[in-house]
Regions:
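Conserved ABC transporter NBD signature motif
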Residues: 64-72
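Helix-to-loop junction immediately C-terminal to a conserved catalytic motif
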Residues: 56
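A short, proline-enriched helix->beta-strand linker immediately N-terminal to the Walker B motif
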Residues: 160-164
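Short coil-to-helix segment of the ABC ATPase nucleotide-binding domain corresponding to the Q-loop/switch region
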Residues: 101-109
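ABC ATPase NBD coupling module
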Residues: 19, 73-89, 118, 190-192
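Conserved ABC ATPase signature
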Residues: 141-145, 149-151
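Catalytic Walker B motif of ABC-type/P-loop ATPase nucleotide-binding domains
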Residues: 166-169
Length: 232
């Protein structure tokens, strides 16, 4: 089969069996093109979170191939991992902000982790905060912000190293419907600026509102892939 893939995401017959014997993925194949916006949906336990972990390098496939921006996740060298991580920004449901650091410092930390210079920090941080509508919150602490604002900071942090791909894992799971719509609209805007966006969610109403490509998982397999609505 295909040995390399330069697209943002390629899964080729990806399987994942955890140490306890759970077969989380049973041969999953799909690709995501540059600049695409994709919803990854399915019931609890369908394999969505395993796919996220494969894309971020948290786990490696038991069989098959997972390629992220040209990096093969099953045989990536330790020293390549920081470079791979630069190409992909991750947004979590629970925000994962550092509580005793300001918004600016949360972003600065993510930039320093990949070796950005002070000048890059100075240019990039105001830009991403402006992009997510939080230009005036640079010196605020997470607990001074609403849930929706904290998720915007998490999105800014995912964007701060200018990744080509953003993966959002249930990004609206802790938000009310109004805020959820705002966050999805923001992700759509980021996608319109050229970033590939993959959103894992189970919120059917939101998915159907946006009319994007939907990859539907069930029991560790892809059972649907295309434009349309999320009906199970």
């Amino acid at each position: 089969g295909v040995q390399t893939c330069a697209l943002p995401i390629c899964l080729i017959d990806a399987e994942k069996v955890y140490d306890n014997g759970t077969r989380a993925l049973k041969g999953v194949s799909f690709t995501v093109d540059d600049g695409e916006f994709v919803f990854l949906v399915g019931p609890s336990g369908s394999g969505k979170s395993t796919i996220i972990k494969l894309m971020t390098g948290e786990v490696v496939p038991t069989a098959g191939r997972v390629m992220v921006n040209g990096f093969s996740m099953s045989r990536i060298a330790e020293k390549q991992i920081p470079y791979m991580r630069r190409t992909i920004g991750v947004i979590f449901q629970d925000f994962r902000l550092i509580g005793n650091k300001t918004v600016r410092d949360n972003l600065a930390l993510a930039m320093r982790a990949v070796g950005a210079s002070p000048r890059e920090l100075k240019n990039r941080i105001p830009y991403v905060l402006e992009l997510v509508g939080l230009a005036d919150k640079e010196n605020s602490y997470p607990d001074q912000l609403s849930g929706g604002e904290q998720q915007r900071v998490a999105i800014a942090r995912a964007l701060v190293n200018n990744p080509s791909t953003i993966v959002a894992d249930e990004p609206t799971g802790n938000l009310d419907p109004g805020r959820s719509l705002e966050i999805m609209t923001l992700l759509e805007r980021i996608n319109a600026l050229g970033t590939t966006v993959i959103v894992v969610t189970h919120e059917r109403g939101l998915v159907n509102h946006f009319n994007k490509r939907i990859i539907l998982l069930n029991d560790g397999q892809v059972i649907g892939d295309g434009l349309g609505s999320y009906e199970v």
